[in-house]
Amino acid sequence: SMDLDCGPLITAKQKERVEGFIRRAIDSGVPLLAQGQIADGVPAGGYYIAPTVFGPVPRGHELACDEVFGPVLSVIPFKDEADAVRLANATDFGLLAGIWTRDGSRQTRMAKDMQCGQVYLNCYGAGGGVELPFGGVKQSGHGREKGFMSLEEFCVIKTVVQYHGD
């Protein structure tokens, strides 16, 4: 059974931005592999976009290099583990990564080598509650939100050393 949960985008401007990514990908010849449907009965006036899958996406294409922030998936082939890590780290962004493998050693290696703020192993978004720090690296976020790490941004640490004499 299908269990899809894809809500609307936040603004009309963002909807137009994502539609632009989709239109430019189609116009440039990137294969459209699948496109979902907007569910019946969604509220009128919502900024809904049908989930869309492209692939193979060329490595230099904007879908492979930019953050779309919409329901668009880019399938990018890779040769091996090292190539996958190199590909993931070659972007200017680093919010999070998802790795699917049964190999526990590979999970550990790749999670360590990924340049991003969060790594999900064999899941995506599971357990990402308020207790886990959230944030990216490079151009994807500043600092950490959620969890105890988020409080550090509001703190000024002061060290006081005092000598009381003999």
What are the residue ranges of the model-derived segments?
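Helix-centric, low-specificity signal for extended rod-like, repetitive segments
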Residues: 7-10, 139
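Short secondary-structure junctions
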Residues: 29-38
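Conserved C-terminal structural/oligomerization subdomain of aldehyde/semialdehyde dehydrogenase
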Residues: 38-41, 45-166
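Short beta-strand to alpha-helix junction loop
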Residues: 9-19
